[in-house]
Swiss-Prot record:
Origin species: Schizosaccharomyces pombe (strain 972 / ATCC 24843) (Fission yeast)
InterPro entries: HDAC_complex_subunit, Zinc_finger_PHD-type_CS, Znf_FYVE_PHD, Znf_PHD, Znf_RING/FYVE/PHD
Biased composition (Basic and acidic residues): 257-266, 294-303, 392-405
Ranges annotated as biased composition (Acidic residues): 241-256
Biased composition (Low complexity): 127-137, 272-287
Matching PANTHER family: HISTONE DEACETYLASE COMPLEX SUBUNIT CTI6
Zinc finger (PHD-type): 48-103
The protein's role, per its UniProt record: Could be a component of the RPD3C(L) histone deacetylase complex (HDAC).
Start-end of Basic residues biased regions: 313-324
Name of this protein: Putative histone deacetylase complex subunit cti6
Gene Ontology biological process terms from the UniProt entry: negative regulation of rDNA heterochromatin formation; transcription initiation-coupled chromatin remodeling
Length: 424
């Protein structure tokens, strides 16, 4: 059983018992106290102090009167503070040193200080034995004197484990779980009842702030959605206006062409009636062919389904005429005539919108590939006819080779684009 007094006090008590009583052999009692013979033997051999901190003393007079605790197996004395016991109330009924039972000790060292241990053995504090011994033994002058405290502030802090310190700090709300950049470094005193009310107020404020943030985010999202809806509505309106603009363009083009044809007829008029008849016939045929082409294109667009039909192109107002570009924008594109000759025709390109869709691009690429295929077939037929008839000059084949190479490069680029952006 661990002793609650110093070795010097126990030696004095043993000497007084020797004078009053004769040595009698008594068996080992169940509460862990030794017999008088064993006490005489231990007193004759001397007490041994072997602590975790590394101090080994065999002289009893070297003790400073602090708290000591004895191992129940090897009867070695150790410093109570070095083993993790600051008061006598914390001492268990049964104690074993770190050599007899190392599993009960958790030895640690802080910096360059002495080693210390934390006793992990389970036991109840010996309050009853303390009261009995205090009532049986009179207070000695050594106990009346103030005991020398060997522990400094650093060693006292080191006696506490870091995990225990964190647990105590959390219990006393020194480390708030949710803090917005503000830390409270107050004393370790227990929190006052006002702290709970303050904590509830802080939690309420945090909840209110979070709700306000959510409301602001929702409002921003709704504004973004409204702006997107406005943009889509404006694009739809522009698309609906586009067919009207195209119809106006076609009417103006027809009027210009008629005026141009009339001027040509008036300028090229001759006294010969045969020439006038030929000119008028040519103009009528050109008009009829143009009308037929337009009607065929309109029928093709009507026959196409809604998903495949091309979307009307968007045009912008330039000057006073809607969607009408200048004459400089017209381009001359060579087309193959059935007779085998290339004829340049004036075409007006449609301006591509900056926000064209991928489906429109795919449709245009497909139409371009189809057109290039027709051109390649016609060029192959033309080259075969020329070779069979007569030998052409050197310039002709070179030009054809150049055009064929350009067509091949264009088809290669279009196929590469189609493979990259095709639907998966």
């Amino acid at each position: 059983m661990p002793s609650n007094s110093t070795p010097a006090n126990e030696e004095k008590e043993e000497e007084s018992e020797k004078i009053q009583k004769s040595p009698v052999d008594t068996p080992h009692t169940p509460n862990g106290s030794v017999s008088d013979n064993e006490e005489n033997e231990t007193s004759s051999t001397g007490e041994v102090t072997r602590c975790v901190c590394g101090i080994v003393e065999s002289d009893d007079e070297a003790s400073d009167g602090g708290l000591y605790i004895q191992c129940d197996q090897c009867s070695v004395w150790q410093h109570g503070n070095c083993v993790g016991f600051a008061d006598e109330s914390e001492v268990p009924e049964v104690y074993y040193c770190e050599i007899c039972h190392p599993e009960f000790h958790k030895v640690y060292q802080r910096g360059r200080g002495a080693k210390q241990s934390k006793y992990l053995g389970n036991g109840k504090p010996i309050e009853a034995s303390q009261t009995e011994e205090s009532s049986s033994t009179p207070p000695s002058p050594a106990t009346k004197k103030s005991s020398k405290q060997r522990l400094t502030m650093n060693s006292r802090d080191a006696a506490l484990d870091y995990e225990e310190y964190l647990a105590i700090a959390k219990e006393k709300s020194l480390i708030p779980r949710r803090s917005r950049g503000r830390t409270s470094s107050k004393s370790l005193s227990p929190p006052a009842p006002q702290d709970e009310s303050q904590g509830t107020e802080i939690n309420l404020k945090q909840k209110i702030e979070e709700e306000n943030d959510e409301i602001l985010e929702d409002s921003k999202e709704s504004k973004d959605e409204n702006e997107e809806n406005k943009e889509t509505s404006t694009t739809n309106v522009a698309e609906t206006d586009a067919p009207e603009e195209e119809t106006v363009d076609t009417v103006e083009e027809i009027a210009d062409e008629e005026k141009h044809s009339v001027k040509e007829e008036s300028g090229e008029a001759s006294p010969q009636s045969s020439q006038q008849s030929t000119i008028t016939s040519i103009s009528t045929t050109t008009r009829s062919t143009r009308k037929a082409k337009r009607e065929a294109a309109a029928e093709d667009k009507a026959d196409l389904p809604a998903a495949v039909a091309p979307k009307p192109s968007k045009t912008r107002k330039v000057g006073g005429r809607r969607g009408k570009s200048s004459s400089n924008d017209n381009h001359r594109i060579p087309q193959l005539h059935p007779d085998g000759t290339f004829v340049e025709t004036i075409t007006k390109p449609k301006g591509l919108h900056s926000r064209i869709t991928m489906t429109e691009m795919r449709r245009r690429v497909a139409s371009m590939l189809e057109y290039i295929g027709h051109i390649q077939v016609e060029m192959a037929a033309q080259s075969a006819g020329n070779q069979s008839s007569t030998k052409s000059s050197k310039e002709g084949p070179e030009e054809e080779k150049e055009t064929l190479r350009m067509v091949d490069n264009l088809t290669r680029d279009l196929l590469h684009w189609e493979q990259r952006f095709s639907r998966t």
